[in-house]
């Protein structure tokens, strides 16, 4: 087989449908838009959530809750992720960022206790869950709140 002999597999290439090109094309006259009305016009159509003038669902349901402006979003790291580091390493938020464990520091790092830690590490983070703190100290390491 040569380059000039290559052919697309059957049914993979579909010809585009040219509308408004005569009645015999099957898409002439109104170009598949039906007769008149909002949806037949250029730029026509209703906005998402519009229900024909009836009170929309999102407005019929009650408002709930609020957004807390003081919310802190911590970057989460689990114990099993820390096993990738060598024994005795001092783990800091900067190290986690540059090794790609976390993509953003957000409001800080929180260490959670999912998985098991098999290495003795010194972990410096902004928050620790009780189980994570216990597991780090059981493995012979230290947990330090920044």
Swiss-Prot record:
> Which top-level group of life is the source organism from?
Bacteria
UniProt-listed SUPFAM superfamilies: Ribosomal proteins L15p and L18e (SSF52080)
rRNA-binding: present as a keyword of the record?
yes
Compositionally biased residues, Basic and acidic residues = 1-18
Give residue spans, biased composition: Gly residues. 42-52
Annotated region (Disordered), positions in chain: 1-58
GO BP, sorted A to Z: translation
InterPro entries found in the cross-reference section: Ribosomal_uL15, Ribosomal_uL15/eL18, Ribosomal_uL15/eL18_sf, Ribosomal_uL15_bac-type, Ribosomal_uL15_CS
Q: Which GO terms describe its cellular component?
A: cytosolic large ribosomal subunit
GO MF entries = rRNA binding; structural constituent of ribosome
Question: What are the entry keywords?
Answer: Ribonucleoprotein, Ribosomal protein, RNA-binding, rRNA-binding
Q: How does it assemble?
A: Part of the 50S ribosomal subunit.
Briefly, what is this protein's role?
A: Binds to the 23S rRNA.
Family of this protein: Belongs to the universal ribosomal protein uL15 family.
**Protein name (record):** Large ribosomal subunit protein uL15
**Organism of derivation:** Oceanobacillus iheyensis (strain DSM 14371 / CIP 107618 / JCM 11309 / KCTC 3954 / HTE831)
What gene is behind this protein? rplO
């Amino acid at each position: 087989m040569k380059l000039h002999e290559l052919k697309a597999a059957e049914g993979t290439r579909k010809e585009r449908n040219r509308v408004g090109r005569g009645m015999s094309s099957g898409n002439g006259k109104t170009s598949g838009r039906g007769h008149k009305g909002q949806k037949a016009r250029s730029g026509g159509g209703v906005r998402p959530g519009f229900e024909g003038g009836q009170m929309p669902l999102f407005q019929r349901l009650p408002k709930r809750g609020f957004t807390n402006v003081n919310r802190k979003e911590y970057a989460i790291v689990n114990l099993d992720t820390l096993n990738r580091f060598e024994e005795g390493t001092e783990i800091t938020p900067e190290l986690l960022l540059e090794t790609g464990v976390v993509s953003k520091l957000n409001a800080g790092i929180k260490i959670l206790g999912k998985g098991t830690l098999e290495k003795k590490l010194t972990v410096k983070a902004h928050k620790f869950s009780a189980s994570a703190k216990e597991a780090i100290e059981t493995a012979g390491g230290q947990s330090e709140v920044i």
